Structure formats: C-alpha cells, structure tokens
C-alpha cells in the first residue's frame, strides 16, 4: 500500500510539473506573415509539391514529409516527420511548425531573400525566452531582432544564423542555437532527391526583457543569405 501511495504521489507531481511547463509555452500564430510552401506533403494519396523552397532564392530545393518521401519511393529518407509538433528536449520546449499532410493549400513558412524583414504581434505576456525555427541558405543570415513592449519601449538583439548545411559546434552547442531537425535530405522541384542528408532546421533562442510585457517582434535581415522562418514559440517568465 505504501509503495502504491508513493507511486501515485510521484505521478501526481509529474503531471502537475508537466502541466505547469505546458502552460508556460505559447506557440505564436504567425499565419499572417507566411508566404511560402517549402515542404512537399502527401494529402489523399497525392503529392503536393513545394512551390517556394529552402535555397536557390526559393527555386532550388525543398523538404518532404516522411510520408511524402516514402510515397515518392525514397528508401529510408532523411525527411521531416509527419507530425510537425516537435517534442520538447533538454534544449527547447515543444515547437509547432506549420506544414501538414492534411493541408495542401496554406503557406508553411515566411521566406526572405536579400534585405528585408517581418513584424508580428503576439499574446501580451512577460517572456523568459523566445525560440525561432529558421534556416539560412547561401551562407549565413545576419539578423536584428527588435522587441516592442506594452509600454512602447524596445530592446534589440543582433544575431548570426549559420548556413543550414553547417554543423553546430559539438563542444556543447551554443546555448542560443541548437538543431530542431537535423541531417535532412533535400529534393528538387520534381521531388527528385538532390542530396540525401546534412541539412538542418536550426532553433535560435533569444531573450526579451522578462520584467516587461512583450507585444510584438520585428525581425530584420541584412542582404546576405536566404532566410526561411518556420515558427516562433515563447516561454512565459511566470
């Protein structure tokens, strides 16, 4: 009986901790800024081919979901998982990307070629950390992230996102940069595999002022590099 009671208490504590952690994580709605479909999906036994890809200024290559790659005849493909909700691990919380095998119509990412930027509003809260799922092709992308708070004050972070072919340092990766998806293949515009592995979706962590309510985020990119912005997630400060 005592052992059963102890196990029950442990389960209750674990569930409470998990629930508390989940309540602190916010998957931001960035639907208004999405402008590209770089992932081929499989819907009703039919491939919907990517239209604006991950490199070559959008016309080079794209990714496939695992089901799409298997349907395509690829053997043991290094493809994106069918479930676009990436599980939490030691480096990041759950991260929700915007592709789906049940959706053959809507855009999946925000792609920026050359100099440019995007701004999006978020649920006003105090945030400890923000996580941006990104890829940069044709070299690194140089970014400035501006945080606009409810009191109309701002703070900034200047960041460098490496090329999506680059391996991240193995001597305990920089805490602000980790893999979200690692060692991916890529496919041409006829869903022909052009490279079998070694490409990534990186996850960049930034830190707004946790004592202020954040209301919007502005990401500006300098001319070098081709940027694909996949998702944004926030971790509340309290």
Per-region residue spans from a language model:
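N-terminal/edge-of-domain interface segments
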Residues: 19-238
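Bacterial Sec-dependent N-terminal signal peptides
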Residues: 1-21
């Amino acid at each position: 009986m005592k052992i059963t009671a102890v196990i029950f208490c442990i389960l209750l504590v674990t569930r409470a901790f998990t629930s508390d952690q989940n309540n602190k994580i916010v998957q931001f709605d960035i639907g208004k800024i999405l402008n590209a479909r770089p992932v081929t999906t499989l819907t009703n036994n039919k491939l919907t081919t990517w239209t604006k890809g991950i490199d070559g200024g959008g016309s080079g290559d794209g990714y496939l979901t695992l089901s799409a790659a298997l349907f395509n005849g690829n053997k043991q493909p290094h493809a994106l998982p069918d479930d676009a909700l990436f599980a939490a691990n030691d480096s990041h919380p759950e991260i929700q990307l915007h592709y789906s095998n049940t959706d053959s119509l809507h855009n999946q990412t925000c792609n920026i070629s050359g100099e440019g930027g995007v701004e999006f509003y978020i649920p006003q809260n105090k945030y400890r950390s923000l996580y941006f799922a990104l890829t940069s092709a044709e070299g690194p992308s140089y970014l400035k992230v501006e945080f606009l708070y409810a009191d109309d004050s701002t703070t900034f972070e200047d960041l460098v996102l490496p090329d999506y072919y680059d391996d991240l340092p193995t001597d305990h990766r920089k805490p602000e940069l980790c893999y979200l998806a690692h060692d991916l293949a890529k496919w041409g515009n006829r869903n022909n595999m052009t490279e079998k592995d070694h490409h990534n979706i990186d996850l960049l962590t930034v830190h707004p002022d946790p004592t202020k309510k954040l209301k919007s985020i502005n990401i500006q990119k300098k001319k070098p590099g081709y940027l694909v912005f996949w998702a944004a997630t926030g971790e509340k400060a309290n």
